[in-house]
């Protein structure tokens, strides 16, 4: 009889689960790793970063940073961290980590500590080259805080996906799906790249990918309980609010005009956020996800019945 007790695990198994978290964190950083990991050009950099001609910017001369530490890459950095966390949570669930005492903690420790190391290295690298002025301290603090918030959000995603019931896990999967789209965009179109060849087919996939992934998560969880219904609704809400928030934060953070005016910047963020919420593109994604999920749920029931009918009695 199943008593609900979790199986104790050895120290070796704990290390293996921790390694899963580390590998997931590294996978999350892939779109940045393939760029060469040069710290983005900084507005407050103390020394001029120019080519031998003395005029052209030379980003390749910037130091190595494990994260794209820049106000122009806040949402991309968050996507890298949350995607890695979502991969860790999914791996933990597939490996049935919640049935083993300490396994989820090991996975969580692996991914969070790895990401903290990456953030600390990037922040220290930036701090070493910034001008010695108040604006540098404010910028460094704000960017580091944003990274910490993303890591905390990722930790929540790990727990939701790896340990929570299906109704809550679908929310974690949906948050991970939104991050994955930004991750994929950075993989196809490397951030800060000067030359990119746009592909209409890839762009179309990136546009509809969030709706498809959120719908897939809803279909996986089902809607057989009140908790799962709530989880599905929250996932659709995240699909509506998440992209609007990303648009607002990216637009405001990338505008130097409001850098010294936090209240005005907050007002601009609010205006862009409200406009993005009412954008037809945002609503199309939500409607598409709802339709795909409805079709998937309708097909899910007979498929499960057929599978149950084939199982031995």
Language-model segments: which ranges?
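Alpha-helical transmembrane segments
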Residues: 14-32, 108-117
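Long, glycine/tryptophan/cysteine-rich extracytoplasmic
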Residues: 19-22, 28-78, 128-130, 188, ...
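Membrane-entry segments of alpha-helical transmembrane domains in multi-pass membrane proteins
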Residues: 10-19, 64-80, 101, 105, ...
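Generic multipass alpha-helical transmembrane bundles of integral membrane proteins
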Residues: 115-264
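Hydrophobic core segments of alpha-helical transmembrane domains in multi-pass membrane transport
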Residues: 20-32, 85-86, 175-182, 212-219, ...
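Cytoplasmic membrane-interface segments at the C-terminal ends of transmembrane helices
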Residues: 2-14, 86-107, 127-130, 153-176, ...
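Hydrophobic alpha-helical transmembrane segments
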Residues: 71-92, 145-155, 206-219, 288-293
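Long, hydrophobic/aromatic-enriched structural stretches that serve as scaffold segments
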Residues: 67-129
């Amino acid at each position: 009889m199943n008593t609900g007790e979790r199986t104790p695990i050895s120290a070796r198994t704990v290390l293996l689960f921790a390694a899963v978290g580390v590998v997931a964190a590294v996978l999350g950083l892939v779109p940045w790793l393939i760029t060469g990991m040069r710290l983005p050009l900084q507005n407050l950099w103390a020394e001029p970063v120019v080519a031998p001609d003395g005029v052209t910017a030379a980003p390749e001369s910037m130091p190595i940073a494990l994260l794209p530490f820049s106000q122009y890459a806040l949402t991309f950095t968050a996507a890298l961290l949350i995607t890695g966390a979502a991969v860790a949570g999914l791996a933990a669930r597939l490996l049935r980590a919640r049935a083993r005492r300490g396994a989820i903690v090991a996975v969580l420790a692996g991914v969070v500590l790895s990401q903290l190391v990456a953030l600390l290295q990037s922040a220290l690298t930036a701090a070493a080259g910034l001008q010695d002025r108040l604006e540098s301290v404010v910028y460094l603090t704000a960017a580091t805080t944003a990274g910490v918030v993303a890591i905390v959000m990722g930790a929540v995603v790990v727990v939701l996906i790896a340990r929570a019931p299906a109704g809550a896990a679908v929310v974690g999967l949906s948050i991970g799906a939104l991050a994955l789209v930004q991750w994929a965009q950075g993989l196809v179109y490397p951030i800060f790249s000067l030359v990119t060849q746009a592909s209409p087919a890839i762009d179309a996939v990136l546009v509809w990918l969030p709706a498809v992934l959120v719908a897939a998560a809803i279909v996986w969880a089902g809607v057989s309980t009140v908790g799962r219904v709530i989880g599905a609704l929250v996932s659709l809400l995240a699909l509506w609010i998440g992209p609007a928030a990303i648009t607002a934060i990216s637009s405001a953070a990338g505008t130097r005009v409001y850098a010294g005016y936090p209240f005005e910047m907050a007002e601009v963020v609010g205006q862009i956020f409200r406009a993005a919420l009412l954008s037809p593109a945002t609503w199309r994604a939500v409607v598409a996800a709802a339709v795909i999920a409805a079709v998937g749920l309708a097909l899910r029931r007979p498929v499960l019945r057929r599978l149950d009918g084939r199982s031995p009695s």
